[in-house]
């Protein structure tokens, strides 16, 4: 009679296996989904004082349905807030007092600027303090800045260039003055945009006039107005440069030179504020027998800017990019791992909750310890092996049919016994 029990248990097990496989197939296109596997064990009736070799099993039972947390394929998207974890870890998301975990990195910003998933749950990470520094350990929902960035007045201007040692001395006869309208009164020129305290742009132009074999005068204008003049209003150099005889770096000046930029009217017709004490650094320049050229030009000021975009680095640092070209950290994504991920409780919607079996989460930044790294503008696909699952489905179907045949055969045997006379 145990054949009936064996067959029924086989039908139940095969049915459960088909349910698991069907769920895997149904979620083969679900972002961050982890496929499950039904695990079975045989069953025996309890029999005391009986040799083990004479026991006959009474069927099969489902021991567990376990999730397989192997890595899914990563595909690129056009949303910079889409995140894929390459390696171990879960995103931590929160709604009210409920904290759950997910591998689904489909994020966007809500009306308040919080990074959240499509259920409105906020992504947890490390925010920035008042000084713009990331606060490790102070986990909280990540929020993008909603305002702009204030302007910064230019405080330094570093220029690295080469002066052509072959050029002729251009100092006009009888006068050391330069005429900005006369290109023959200077050898070379270069320009840079600097900013006043209001973020208004100022066109700062430098003119270089060779006065002897290794000496150059450096003049400057702001929006066409000389920044240094004598009592008669005629231009004066802001500094002079003296080079070594071998053409190496200058011996004068050896340190940045402070220049004061007066209030002027810029190209937009706006009256700009004076910019005092701009440190002009030309100490890395050279004078060789090659054409004049600017190798690098840098200044540290900028105009006001509005939030223009966001990017997330592989370490989880969220960078806010502004319309003035500036970028600032807005926080850092936190990841969590568990001693036993199999112990996590599936909550649906690609979410898991911690349990006693899983242990408490161990949190950290991406790339630290055994945590994976993030890929921005990408998503982790379902790890369902669709081809393999379709094969498993056919196998489970055949097993179901075979167990049904076991019951049918046993019924025929019993019918034969009943018909005996």
Task: Identify the residue ranges that each predicted region occupies.
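Alpha-helical heptad-repeat coiled-coil segments that mediate oligomerization/polymerization in large
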Residues: 7, 11-14, 29-40, 326, ...
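Small/polar low-complexity and glycine-rich loop motifs
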Residues: 34-385, 390-392, 399
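Acidic/polar, glycine-anchored loop/turn motif associated with catalytic or activation segments
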Residues: 403
């Amino acid at each position: 009679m145990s054949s009936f029990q064996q067959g029924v248990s086989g039908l139940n097990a095969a049915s459960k296996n088909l349910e698991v496989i069907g769920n895997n197939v149904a979620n083969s296109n679900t972002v961050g989904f982890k496929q499950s596997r039904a695990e079975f064990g045989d069953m025996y009736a309890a029999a005391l004082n009986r040799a083990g070799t004479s026991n006959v099993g009474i069927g099969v039972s489902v021991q567990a349905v376990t999730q397989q947390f192997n890595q899914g394929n990563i595909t690129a998207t056009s949303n910079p807030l889409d995140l894929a974890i390459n390696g171990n870890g879960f995103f931590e998301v929160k709604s009210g007092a409920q904290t759950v975990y997910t591998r689904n990195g489909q994020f966007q910003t809500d009306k308040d600027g919080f990074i959240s998933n499509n259920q409105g749950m906020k992504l947890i990470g490390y925010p920035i303090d008042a000084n713009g520094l990331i606060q490790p350990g102070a986990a909280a929902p990540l929020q993008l800045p909603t305002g702009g960035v204030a302007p910064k007045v230019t405080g330094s201007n570093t220029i690295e260039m080469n002066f052509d040692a072959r050029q002729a001395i251009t100092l006009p006869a009888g006068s050391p003055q330069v005429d900005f309208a006369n290109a023959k009164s200077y050898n070379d020129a270069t320009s840079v945009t600097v900013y006043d305290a209001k973020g208004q742009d100022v066109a700062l132009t430098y003119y270089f006039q060779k006065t002897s074999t290794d000496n150059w005068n450096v003049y400057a204008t702001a929006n066409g107005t000389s920044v240094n003049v004598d009592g008669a209003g005629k231009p004066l150099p802001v500094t002079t440069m003296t080079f070594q005889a071998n053409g190496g770096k200058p011996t004068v000046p050896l340190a940045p030179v402070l220049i004061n930029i007066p209030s002027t009217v810029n190209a937009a017709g706006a009256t700009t504020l004076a910019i005092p004490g701009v440190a002009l650094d030309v100490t890395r320049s050279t004078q060789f027998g090659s054409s004049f050229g600017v190798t690098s030009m840098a200044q540290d000021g900028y105009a006001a800017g509005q939030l223009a975009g966001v990017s997330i680095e592989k370490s989880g640092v969220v960078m806010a990019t502004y319309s003035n070209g500036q970028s600032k950290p807005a926080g850092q994504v936190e990841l969590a791992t568990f001693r036993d991920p199999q112990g996590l409780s599936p909550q649906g919607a690609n979410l898991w909750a911690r349990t006693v079996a899983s242990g408490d989460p161990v949190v950290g930044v991406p790339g630290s310890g055994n945590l994976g790294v993030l890929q921005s503008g990408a998503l982790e696909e379902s790890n369902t092996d669709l081809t393999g699952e379709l094969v498993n489905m056919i196998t489970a179907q055949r097993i179901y049919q075979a167990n049904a045949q076991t019951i049918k055969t046993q019924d025929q045997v019993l019918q034969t016994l009943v018909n005996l006379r």
